[in-house]
Every structure is written in C-alpha cells, then in structure tokens.
C-alpha cells in the first residue's frame, strides 16, 4: 500500500511556499487539501471536489482518505472529483460507519448509472431500456423494499 497517496483535510491555510490561496500541498506520500477558513460547507465540498480533480488529472491513480475530518458528504465530493471515464482509479475511503459506507456506495452506484445513461449511445438507450435500467438500479439499491411494474404500450 506504499504506492497509495494519503489525502488529509486541513483546516489551516497552506504554507506560503505553496502559493497564496493554495488548496493542495504535498509532503512525501501525503496530500493535504486546505480548507482554510471556509465557513460554508458547500464551499468546502466544492474545494474538495476541485482538489480531487486536480489530483486525478496530475496522474495520481490510487488514494486513501485519512484523518478525522472526512464525513459522508466530503467523501462523496472527493469521489465526484476523483473520476475519469477511462482508466482505473482506486479510492480507499478510510474508516467509516457501516451505514455511511452503504449510503456512499449507493450514491456512487447512482452517479455511475447517470453517467452511463448520459454518455450512452441513443441506440442502446430507448424508453423501455431506460425504464428497465432505472428499475434495476432502484431495486438494487432498495432491495425488498421496492416494488414496481413497467407499463408499456399506448
């Protein structure tokens, strides 16, 4: 696991050597995402997603989220930014509760489905296939709690 980049959130501003307002700093196998004095959580989530995108675009393919400042929304924001349509990425979300892990997995599955539908070719995504695909996703996420019926025709 030595080749994984550890990613930690920091509430401190980055050192001056990284530039004014820098959102990322590096030290060995650890990257810090500097949230600084961000007061609004929505701004923090945007910063986290943007930083993840920068890491991914710089060629980093394997990361592990470390530290106590990661919650469900922050992990999901990072996952949104650490995405590429081509090539494998490995993202270890670090320790989290079982319920958070299930919810995060469901969010990521739903996001992946939306991307596949959005980027799919029109021949493969016609109304019935879209309905069936959506139903499979929802049943996969909801399990026995979901019942549905597709009505086709005029």
Where are these regions (language model features)?
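Short amphipathic alpha-helical segment within the helicase RecA-like ATPase core
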Residues: 1-154
């Amino acid at each position: 696991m030595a080749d994984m980049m550890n990613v930690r959130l920091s509430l401190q501003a980055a050192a001056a050597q990284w530039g004014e307002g820098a959102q990322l700093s590096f030290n060995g196998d650890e990257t810090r995402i500097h949230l600084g004095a961000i007061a609004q959580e929505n701004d923090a989530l945007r910063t986290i997603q943007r930083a993840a995108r920068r890491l991914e675009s710089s060629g980093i393919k394997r990361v592990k989220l470390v530290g106590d400042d990661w919650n469900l929304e922050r992990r999901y924001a990072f996952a949104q930014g650490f995405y590429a349509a081509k090539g494998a990425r490995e993202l270890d979300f670090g320790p989290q509760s079982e319920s958070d892990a299930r919810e995060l997995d469901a969010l990521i599955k739903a996001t992946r489905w939306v991307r596949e539908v959005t980027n799919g070719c029109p021949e493969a995504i016609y109304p019935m296939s879209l309905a069936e695909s959506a139903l499979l996703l929802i049943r996969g996420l909801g399990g026995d709690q979901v019942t549905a019926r597709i009505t086709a025709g005029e």
